[in-house]
C-alpha cells in the first residue's frame, strides 16, 4: 500500500500563497464585474494604444544603434520603457484584473506590430530587477535608475 508521509493538513484560513496570488492576479468575480462594466474592453484598447506609441518611440533615431549608442544600451532603454508601461498600468489601473487585461493586450499588439521589439522588451530577467526596485516602495526613481545603470 502506498503511504503519503508528506501530506499537509490545511487549516480553516486560506494560505498566504492563495492570498498573494489573488493580489497578483485578481479573482474571477472581479474580472467578470470589470468585463460587465466595460473596463476590460477599455483596458485592452489602452494596451493596444500603448503598444503603438511604444513602437513609435522605439523606432525614433535615439533608439537606434550608432556611435553613441551600443546595442546593449538600446536594449536596456527598450526594456526600461517597457517596464515603465507595465508599472504605470499596475499603478494607475483601478485593480489588477484591469491592469492584467491591458498588459496582455500591450504585449499581444506589440508582438503583431514588431516581433523583434517584442522580444527585446520582454526580458524577464531585467524585469525582475526593475520590479524589485519598484515594489520596494521607497526611492523608486533612484532605485530604478540604479537598476538601469547596473544592467547597462
Per-region residue spans from a language model:
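Short runs of predominantly hydrophobic/aromatic residues within well-ordered alpha helices
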Residues: 21, 43, 47, 51, ...
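Membrane-helix exit/interface motif
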Residues: 89, 93, 114, 118-129
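Low-complexity intrinsically disordered segments
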Residues: 122-152
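Short secondary-structure junctions and interdomain/linker hinges
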Residues: 57, 61-65, 113, 117, ...
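Long, acidic, intrinsically disordered low-complexity segments
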Residues: 2-42, 126-137
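N-terminal interaction modules that seed assembly of large macromolecular complexes
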Residues: 53-98
Amino acid at each position: 500500500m502506498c503511504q503519503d508521509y508528506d501530506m499537509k493538513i490545511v487549516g480553516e484560513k486560506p494560505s498566504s500563497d492563495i492570498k498573494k496570488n489573488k493580489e497578483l492576479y485578481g479573482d474571477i468575480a472581479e474580472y467578470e464585474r470589470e468585463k460587465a462594466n466595460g473596463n476590460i474592453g477599455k483596458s485592452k484598447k489602452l494596451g493596444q494604444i500603448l503598444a503603438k506609441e511604444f513602437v513609435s518611440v522605439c523606432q525614433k533615431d535615439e533608439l537606434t544603434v550608432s556611435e553613441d549608442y551600443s546595442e546593449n544600451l538600446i536594449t536596456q532603454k527598450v526594456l526600461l520603457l517597457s517596464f515603465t508601461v507595465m508599472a504605470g498600468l499596475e499603478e494607475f489601473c483601478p485593480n489588477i484584473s484591469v491592469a492584467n487585461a491591458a498588459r496582455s493586450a500591450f504585449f499581444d499588439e506589440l508582438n503583431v506590430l514588431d516581433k523583434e521589439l517584442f522580444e527585446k522588451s520582454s526580458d524577464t530577467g531585467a524585469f525582475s530587477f526593475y520590479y524589485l526596485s519598484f515594489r520596494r516602495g521607497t526611492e523608486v526613481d533612484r532605485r530604478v535608475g540604479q537598476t538601469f545603470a547596473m544592467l547597462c
